[in-house]
């Protein structure tokens, strides 16, 4: 079936490639940094013929007669560019790309400065960042690694490719941060289709909101939200890449789109495959070889049960830019994952061998978007996803192993086996979690005029879950639980744009509804019949907030935002997940937080060939009923294989600041630096202390330089250098007030360095890149002190067809 799907995609693209596109001009309009400029004007002078670029900055002009023509491109706030092109018999399909430089114009006494999507998002008042993926798509970089370079964002990963990931925004992590794909909660897609596996080439841009989340996302997050915006597919293109590197890591992806100009019929498809042995070197207190007499010897060894594979794809058919829809798509998303498990929550003395997880998902999706729906100013968008997800936990190997990768030998010289018959002490299992999942995101907005806009949004997500286990009898399976979790989040927002666009205000309210239903078959009191023990919870909550910005001068913008945020417990926190060693907690309650951000943005200052932008944000969070691990010495032990999320008694407070600097010179040199410093405190054993397992001080820096016409005319060489710093932090509270020996719980200070280069060949359709990660092979640790891979090398080939 997988091979048939791949062949079908191949023939579809080959057929599309053969279409006749004679007499057609295509291309893109971007700023000098390569960021798309939507709705730029492209006109052929003398023909009274022109178009506007789409949301991705691409344009197409058809039926252009033979001969020479002058093409003029303009965009408010940017300089006008013109080029002469020629349509002739041997070259009827011409591609022309434009880069526009930012300018400041004065129209009737009003200063107008062009804004890209990135600038517009980051100056609305929210503590927000827009991350472009254009350069990262050409390199051997995962989407998570790209996020990790962003100010205030820290990726918490339990190992190498495919390992469990948590996203930390200003110190708040886990389910406190919501992740979306085009506004749909990513949890709907399951572990086999996540940011570990989705390559940057599938992504248009990433929006990061810290602390305060706008109403249109309808999110139940107290830490913030990350919204992955996929490419819309308004331009004929095909992109294929393959990357290979250390640890036998292979990553491939194929994505493309075809649009019939006359009918608007559009096809989008993408596919990916990732694999890694993840057999990197590790060391530490618990990494030991155990002799038959029980003597433990510290060793440096390789992980040996940590391979990862994921395969998936998405295909959509529909129409774009037609009279009845800006976008209409129906499609399918399919994914499959295999993930070996090396250890439990902590890196314990006894590693796992033979324990692995398998996941798959098959989901249908529908998208409809239309501006000026029925009446001018009324915009509508609806996205729906429905499908099935399965996860199998396979743990049937009883043999005990040491970190040397060999069998554990007993006093009698014979290999040992665990008495419980599996790697995990809970006993052998082939547990299956089957889920029916659904989510619908709908939104209406009405623009009264240039100053006032109202938005109404609703997000529904539901999970119907059924557990079973092939390793237990049919009778025992009748006692497996069934679980349902439903969420509704409704938001109403008002946007004000006043004083010649100097003041922007976004005020919103949110209403949250959650229903939990758990059915557990049990024997009645006299053990004569099986009855259903039902737990049901129906609760609703209300939150609200605002964001505001004021332009003091064209280069100084003040920003502030605040929200009373609610975070509803997630499915795994409520029902548990044996694959992640999580125990259920049916009575867990939502957590709440009062969040506030105050900051400013300076720039962009253009000083001849120099460009400088500086932004900073001060933030505070007051979290009550916090959901977390019982991270004190009595409630959480390193020997624990299972953990349970619970509501922690004491309030937590997060206060800190973040700052970011961008510098560019002559569009060739780019430098960025960001810093984030905070205190995240609570009370433990009567003493105020920092919340464990949370990095409090991080810095990132990046340097890029571009050589044009390197070796070959019209070629480009880009060099990249990045460095990452994380200060030491504890992953557990010390026992009581006595801090003697607490260094055992410290994750040490860490600095790592990456280097990369990409070479674009003259026709811009072939790119070769090379990356070195963790150049100096430093020991890097992360979530709960799990060590991450050392130095690694990767080579990537990209082939791009921008028009066919």
Predicted features, each with a name:
Residues 316-321, 325-336, 359-528, 539-545, ...:
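Face-selective signature of the C-terminal outer-membrane beta-barrel domain
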Residues 144-185:
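Extracytoplasmic beta-strand/coil segments of soluble accessory domains associated
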Residues 30-32, 40-43, 74-78, 88-137:
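Short, acidic, small-residue-rich periplasmic hinge/interaction motif at the N-terminus
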Residues 559-563, 591-647, 653:
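Membrane-embedded beta-barrel scaffold of Gram-negative outer-membrane proteins
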């Amino acid at each position: 079936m997988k091979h048939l799907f791949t062949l079908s995609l191949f023939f579809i693209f080959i057929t599309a490639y053969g279409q006749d596109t004679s007499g057609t001009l295509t291309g893109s309009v971007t700023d000098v940094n390569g960021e798309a400029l939507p709705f730029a004007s492209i006109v052929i002078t003398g023909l009274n013929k022109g178009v506007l670029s789409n949301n991705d900055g691409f344009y197409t002009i058809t039926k252009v007669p033979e001969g020479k023509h002058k093409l003029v491109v303009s965009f408010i706030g940017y300089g006008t560019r013109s080029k002469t092109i020629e349509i002739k018999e041997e070259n009827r399909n011409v591609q022309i790309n434009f880069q526009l430089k930012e300018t400041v114009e004065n129209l009737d006494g009003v200063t107008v400065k062009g804004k890209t999507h990135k600038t517009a998002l980051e100056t609305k008042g929210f503590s927000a960042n827009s991350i472009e993926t254009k350069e990262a798509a050409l390199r051997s970089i995962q989407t998570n690694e790209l996020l990790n370079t962003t100010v205030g964002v820290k990726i918490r990963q339990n190992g190498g490719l495919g390992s469990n990931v948590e996203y930390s925004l200003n110190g708040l992590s886990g389910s406190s941060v919501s992740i979306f794909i085009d506004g749909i909660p990513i949890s709907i897609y399951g572990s086999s289709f996540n940011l570990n596996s989705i390559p940057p080439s599938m992504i248009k841009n990433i929006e990061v909101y810290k602390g305060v989340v706008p109403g249109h996302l309808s999110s139940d997050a107290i830490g913030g939200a990350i919204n992955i915006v996929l490419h819309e597919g308004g331009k004929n293109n095909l992109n294929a890449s393959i990357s290979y590197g250390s640890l036998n890591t292979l990553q491939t992806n194929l994505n493309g789109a075809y649009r019939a100009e006359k009918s608007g019929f559009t096809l989008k498809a993408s596919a990916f495959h990732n694999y890694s042995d993840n057999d990197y070197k590790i060391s530490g207190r618990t990494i030991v070889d155990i002799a038959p007499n029980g003597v433990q010897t510290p060793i440096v060894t390789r992980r040996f049960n940590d391979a990862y594979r994921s395969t998936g794809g998405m295909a959509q058919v529909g129409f774009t830019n037609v009279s009845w829809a800006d976008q209409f798509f129906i499609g399918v998303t399919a994914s499959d994952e295999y993930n070996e498990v090396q250890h439990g929550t902590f890196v314990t003395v006894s590693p796992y061998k033979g324990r692995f997880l398998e996941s798959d998902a098959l989901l249908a999706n529908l998208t409809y978007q239309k501006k000026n729906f029925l009446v001018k100013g009324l915009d509508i968008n609806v996205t729906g996803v429905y499908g099935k997800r399965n996860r199998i936990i396979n743990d049937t190997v009883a043999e005990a192993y040491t970190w040397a990768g060999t069998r554990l030998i007993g006093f009698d010289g014979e290999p040992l086996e665990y008495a419980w018959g599996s790697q995990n002490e809970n006993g052998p299992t082939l547990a299956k979690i089957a889920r029916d999942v659904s989510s619908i995101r709908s939104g209406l907005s009405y623009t009264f005029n240039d100053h006032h806009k109202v938005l109404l949004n609703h997000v529904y997500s539901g999970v119907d879950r059924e557990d079973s286990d092939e390793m237990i009898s049919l009778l025992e399976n009748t006692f497996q639980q069934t679980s349902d979790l439903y969420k509704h989040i409704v938001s109403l927002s008002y946007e004000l744009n006043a004083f010649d666009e100097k003041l922007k205000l976004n005020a919103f309210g949110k209403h949250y509804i959650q229903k939990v239903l758990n059915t557990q078959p049990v024997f009645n009191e006299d053990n004569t019949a099986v009855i259903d023990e039902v737990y049901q919870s129906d609760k609703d909550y209300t939150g609200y907030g605002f964001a505001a910005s004021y332009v003091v001068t064209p280069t100084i913008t003040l920003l502030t935002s605040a929200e009373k945020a609610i975070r509803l417990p997630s499915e795994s926190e409520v029902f548990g997940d044996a694959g992640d060693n999580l125990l259920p907690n049916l009575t867990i309650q939502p957590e709440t937080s009062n969040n506030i951000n105050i900051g400013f943005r300076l720039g962009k200052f253009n000083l001849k060939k120099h460009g400088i932008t500086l932004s900073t944000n001060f933030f505070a969070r007051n979290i009550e009923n916090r959901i977390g691990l019982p991270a004190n010495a009595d409630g959480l032990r390193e020997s624990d294989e299972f953990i349970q999320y619970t509501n922690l008694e004491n309030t937590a407070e997060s206060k800190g600041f973040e700052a970011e600097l961008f510098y560019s010179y002559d569009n060739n040199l780019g430098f960025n630096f960001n810093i984030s410093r905070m205190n995240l405190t609570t009370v433990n054993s009567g003493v105020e202390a920092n919340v464990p397992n949370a990095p409090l001080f991080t810095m990132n820096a990046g340097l890029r330089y571009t050589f044009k016409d390197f070796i070959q005319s019209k070629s480009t060489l880009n060099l990249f250098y990045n460095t990452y710093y994380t200060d030491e932090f504890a992953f557990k509270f010390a026992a009581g007030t006595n801090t003697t020996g607490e260094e055992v719980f410290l994750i040490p200070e860490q600095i790592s360095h990456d280097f990369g280069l990409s070479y674009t060949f003259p026709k811009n359709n072939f790119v070769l890149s090379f990356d070195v990660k963790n150049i100096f092979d430093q020991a890097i640790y992360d979530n709960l002190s799990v060590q991450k891979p050392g130095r690694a090398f990767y080579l990537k080939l990209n082939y791009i067809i921008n028009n066919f």
